[in-house]
Amino acid sequence: MENLIALLVAAPLLGAVVLLCGGRRLDRVGHWIGTLLAAVSFVLGVVLFADLLGSGAEDRTLTQHLFSWIPVEGFQADVAFRLDQLSMTFVLLITGVGSLIHLYSVAYMEHDERRRRFFGYLNLFLAAMLILVLADNYLLLYVGWEGVGLASYLLIGFWQHKPSAATAAKKAFLVNRVGDMGLSIGIMLMFLWFGTFAFGPVLGGHGEAGLAAGADEGKLTAIALMLLLAACGKSAQVPLQSWLGDAMEGPTPVSALIHAATMVTAGVYLIVRSGAIFNGAPDAQLVVTIVGAVTLLFGAIVGCAKDDIKKALAGSTMSQIGYMVLAAGLGPIGYVFAIMHLVTHGFFKAGLFLGAGSVMHGMNDEVDMRRYGGLRKYMPVTFVTFGLGYLAIIGFPGLSGFFSKDKIIEAAFAKGGTEGWILGACALLGAAITAYYMTRVMLMTFFGEERWRNAPTPSPAKPDVEPAAETRGTYEPPHPHESPGLMTIPMIVLAVGSVGAGAFFSIGDRFMHWLEPITGHSHGDSPISAGAVTGATVACMVIGVAVAWAQYGRRPVPAVAPRGSLLTRAARRDLLQDDFNHVVLVRGGEHLTRSLVYVDHTVVDGVVNGTAASVGGLSGRMRRLQNGFARSYAVSMFGGAALLVAATLLMRAV
């Protein structure tokens, strides 16, 4: 079975090579090739999953060594894959949700002339993400990490004819460079202090402690903080979150892939996989929980003010990943629940984004929710599937988000002390805000009056406009209609996961028992009972829904956004994150550049030019001595001899 692990990666990687290098001859079938190879990878994942289930809980680790990558004396870096319970969970999520997104994209990108290339990029994304989660060492993980960054750049900027898309791709790439630098430094520190960066020796396993278990706390803290910086970049956590909203410039299937199953989950995987390092660095764990708590509130507040349906969901993604990071920062109490919420989030967030794409498909690519309204009558399948995803994300009792989010809130309170109360309160507040902004999205899109009938001009921001439609210069009023079967079938499958995944994982604590041999698990002493936490969570959800209903359900939604409060205006601008970056980083960089230019011109060039001028002046004076007269040379010789005699007499006198 070990030999099948490489095929997991090889299938989408082969698809990427064939589609990107095959040329226009594959335009007619390229999308099906990409979808088929993604599905093949999923089937292989299911086969390997069945094999792991047939093994004992402590024997569910398969490794496949391919070749030695960097063999030098005293050191060896291997290309090897590691399949255990944690990586298996990600494999099924990546390939399963990824295959559904491929199928959805067949219809969604039907009229795009570059569809073959798009599917090549999707396959490349899957292959890179699979390398990331299957790597047996941090160096190979870094290869997958960078591959994900490259593929996201290509997908976000897929419509590069739009300046906004090109800028968004560049922004995502550059912001992630900061996080990537953290990962590279962390790997260097591991090699410096441990002499290796393979998972087995560093992290341990199978009941044996790794090098991290006995390492100095200061060293572990330094490594953990660098890994956290990397996670903040890929998972769009504060302070490296500014790229996520702009990433909506890519086609909607890209948003679903990035926000649900792949890129933004990479940071959570890195933290949980490196649990042995974080467990020995309590200060770093505290920073992780703070980052998660701040981000879950940051993203939720941003989502409350967005009228662009995709950007509202982007704020939601930032917030939900914040929950996962918070749980991962709690240590063994929260690792399992972080991954559980990651999986359930993969179902309902992918479904929500695909539902948003379906709405846009039926609304001439309109993204402004103020130009929607009453669409449930025209898009019944989209309405039901989107509605189930909505109920899951707000934590409606019985649906998947209820189980996973509730467990994280319980774990936060179980942390104990003041820290536990603060983290638990932040998580509860985030639950209320989540219910508010998602109810707002639901009401503005599917309920109320049909505002699109009175919208004579298109919205100025339409990220999913094809080149022909964008340059045509005319506007056809929308005629809302349901999407074709190739788009609705993936939405239905994801809706089923949104409904049942949480309960399936929670019955008998089967998900906890599945991951516990890898992540470990411990039970904290919560100051409040699990029932009280559940009651508080449901109460927060009801409050959020009620407030949103009072504002957007009982009142007409204005076609033009009102000015709003100071917080609302700031949230529309992503809580001024770009302004902050410009003032602190860009403007500071400009001042530093000007200072360096001044130093270069005055000091560096001054020394060089001054030396040259001095040599030139001295040469000019020396040239005057060479006048061609013998008497001048005789006088010079006499003077030199006199000076020599005087110096000799002076030295003897001394």
Swiss-Prot record:
Keyword Translocase tagged: yes
Transmembrane segments: 3-23, 29-49, 88-108, 124-144, 185-205, 220-240, 285-305, 323-343, 383-403, 416-436, 485-505, 530-550, 634-654
Chain residue ranges for the region called Disordered: 455-479
Enzyme Commission code: 7.1.1.-
Gene3D superfamilies: 1.20.5.2700
Keyword Protein biosynthesis: no
Localization in the cell: Cell membrane
Pfam families in the record: Proton_antipo_M (PF00361), Proton_antipo_N (PF00662)
One Gene Ontology cellular component annotation held by this UniProt entry: plasma membrane
A GO term for molecular function: NADH dehydrogenase (ubiquinone) activity
Keywords: Cell membrane, Membrane, NAD, Quinone, Translocase, Transmembrane, Transmembrane helix
Catalyzed reaction equations: a quinone + NADH + 5 H(+)(in) = a quinol + NAD(+) + 4 H(+)(out)
Task of the protein: NDH-1 shuttles electrons from NADH, via FMN and iron-sulfur (Fe-S) centers, to quinones in the respiratory chain. Couples the redox reaction to proton translocation (for every two electrons transferred, four hydrogen ions are translocated across the cytoplasmic membrane), and thus conserves the redox energy in a proton gradient.
Protein name: NADH-quinone oxidoreductase subunit L
Species: Streptomyces coelicolor (strain ATCC BAA-471 / A3(2) / M145)
UniProt gene name: nuoL
